[in-house]
């Protein structure tokens, strides 16, 4: 499995945890309805639809309300596995969050929750 596939799987798991974990829906309900587009460099786009506190990965990336853009696969993996803090990633231009800030901030909390839950299982 290459890094992009691992990142996609990690984000899919984060979306699943947001919908099923006791803490996940509380976070997801803080997000506005619409789309969040997760980008990894120029090679990977993962659109996530948010509707009434439920997240789903969809095919259409058009018209996102927020964009969470990782500079490359290495930066994305480091952030998604909590090896790099979002603050340092932003300072060093590894993470760019645009659009509706509450969507980006909440998604950040969701991916950190996913890391915590996935780490507990291992």
Mark where each language-model region is:
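Feature captures hydrophobic
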Residues: 1-122
């Amino acid at each position: 499995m290459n890094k992009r596939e691992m990142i996609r799987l990690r984000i899919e798991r984060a979306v699943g945890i947001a919908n099923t974990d006791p803490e996940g829906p509380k976070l997801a309900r803080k997000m506005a309805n619409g789309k969040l587009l997760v980008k990894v460099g120029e090679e990977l786009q993962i659109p996530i639809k948010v509707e009434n506190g439920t997240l789903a990965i969809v095919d259409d990336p058009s018209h996102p309300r927020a964009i969470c853009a990782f500079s490359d696969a290495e930066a994305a993996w480091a952030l998604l596995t909590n090896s790099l803090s979002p603050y340092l990633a932003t300072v060093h231009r590894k993470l760019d969050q645009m659009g509706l800030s509450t969507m980006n901030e909440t998604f950040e909390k969701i991916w950190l929750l996913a890391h915590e839950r996935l780490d507990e299982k291992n």
